[in-house]
Amino acid sequence: MNGMIEIHDFTERYLEDAAAIALRLWEAAIPGMPVEMRTRIYRYLVRYYYIPGSPLSLRAMENGKLCAFLLGAPASEIGSEHADKWMAGQLNGTEESVFFQEYKAYIDGNRRQEYLHAATNEASLLLFASIRRGAGKKLLEEFEKRCRSHGMTSIILWTDETCDFDYYHRNGFTEAAKFPADPTICDLKLTTYLFRKSVK
């Protein structure tokens, strides 16, 4: 039975629930990702984009359960090292370490492009996922409201073909740049897209 969707701050308590949502949505997004690493990769991904204390990170709850989340921060914040420290204790052997370094280089490279293209007073939409229809829209509306209240005038994000980037077209974002992903991952020919939206 569907209940009312409530929006709250995202906190460390919800990292594992968010990782489970990410795994559910993107488990097969990257062909070539070792099956045995998928759970750990998405647990890492959520930690990579979680910036403790950011007022721009949100969660959507329904009947007491996480149904969507949005991690955001001022674009001037490049992130923290807590995810790498966490992952260091999760890897088993050389093969896993090699794949992880390739994966990390891929997201680091795209995050760096987002950082370099960011404007003054811009917020980064870092990671966004929903398993409940309508919850994502509510999160995005609250995110935009919080961006304005914290002096942000626009939002930037990066995405690629493994995501539903048409969603951003449908919600008022415009394509700011696109280029071949460098480095790429698993020999995929991916394109990195940067999207931007004014929230003035």
Model-flagged regions — what are they?
Residues 35-57, 61-63, 67, 71:
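Active-site rim helix/loop that mediates acceptor-substrate recognition in acyltransferases
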Residues 20-36:
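Helix-loop element at the rim of GNAT/NAT acetyltransferase active sites that forms part
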Residues 76-127, 131, 185-187:
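Conserved acyl-donor/pantetheine-binding loop and adjacent beta-alpha core of acyl/acetyltransferases
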Residues 133-145, 170:
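Conserved acetyl-CoA-binding loop-helix of GNAT-fold acetyltransferases
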Residues 153-165, 181-200:
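C-terminal "cap" of GNAT-fold acetyltransferases
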